[in-house]
Each structure stands twice: as C-alpha cells, then as structure tokens.
C-alpha cells in the first residue's frame, strides 16, 4: 500500500525533473549553435571586443556593442557578426551582415536576456576565419521566461 508521503514525493520529483534543464544541455546547445554558424571552421578566441554590462538589473532591454578591429578592405573584412546566448529560448540573438563598405566592423543593439547566462559574439571574416569573445552576464530581473 502506497503512503501519501510516497505519492507526494514522487510527484515532486517528477515535476522537478520536467521543469529543470541541466546546465550542460544549455552549454552544449550554445556550442552547437556557434559551430553551426562557423560552418565547420574553427572558432578562435580573440579579435572581438564585446561590450555589455557584467551585471544587468533588467533583462528586458540590455545594450550590447560588438567591435572587430579590421581594415574593412576588399582583401580583409568582416562578413558577419553574430551574438549567441546560453539560456534564452533561441540560441541566436542577432546576426549582422557587413561588407568592406561598412567602414567599421561595429554593431550595437539591445537584446533580452532570460536570466544570468553566458553570451558569445562571433565574427566571420571574408577568408572564412571565425573569431569570438565569451562573456558571463548576471541578470537580476529576467526576460524571455517561458510560462
């Protein structure tokens, strides 16, 4: 005969296992999204400057700037800058296409963050090389939270 205590404990465990996603799944999904963007090219750390506050009070509108020092000439320029996140419902936050006429490889926007997480900015160069910068951001009031 099952006791009430056993039923309640089993139900709580089942609910917890459905609602809680392991952090490794988020990290694996983030790495997979970055790798898919790179298209098989190795993603190396460096060359990307990623400006975002390390502590964000409200995740609903977070200013972000990504810069890549590049001469932006026909022979050497940034073709794409992408921003990825670890915990939002979709891993790709933004994707910007650039060319030599852009003059500077700098993009600014505002994003939403679903809690404290890791962000990755990746720059793809015209020769196929990919450079990245990873930043951890603490968010006190989350956005993008699924019910």
Label the predicted regions:
Residues 1-18:
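N-terminal secretory signal peptides and thylakoid transit peptides that target proteins
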Residues 114-118:
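Extracellular Ig-like/FN3 beta-sandwich strand-entry sites
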Residues 63-71:
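Short edge beta-strand/loop segments characteristic of extracellular beta-sandwich folds
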Residues 24-59, 96-97:
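Transition segment at domain starts
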Residues 89-112:
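An anionic, turn-rich surface loop/hairpin at beta-sheet edges
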Residues 126-132:
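Short acidic/polar inter-strand loop motif in beta-rich domains
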Residues 136-140:
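Short beta-strand edge segments in extracellular beta-sheet folds
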């Amino acid at each position: 005969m099952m006791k009430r205590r056993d039923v309640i404990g089993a139900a709580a465990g089942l609910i917890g296992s459905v609602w809680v996603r392991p952090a490794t799944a988020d990290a694996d999904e983030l790495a997979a999204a970055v790798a898919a963007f790179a298209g098989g090219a190795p993603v190396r750390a460096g060359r990307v400057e990623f400006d975002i506050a390390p502590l964000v009070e409200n995740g609903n509108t977070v200013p972000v700037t990504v810069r890549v020092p590049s001469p932006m000439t026909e022979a050497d320029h940034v073709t794409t800058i992408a921003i990825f996140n670890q915990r939002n419902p979709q891993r790709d936050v933004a994707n910007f296409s650039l060319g030599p006429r852009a003059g500077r490889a700098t993009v600014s926007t505002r994003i939403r963050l679903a809690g404290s997480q890791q962000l990755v900015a990746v720059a793809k160069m015209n020769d196929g090389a990919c450079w990245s910068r990873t930043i951890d951001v603490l968010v006190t009031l989350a956005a993008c939270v699924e019910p």
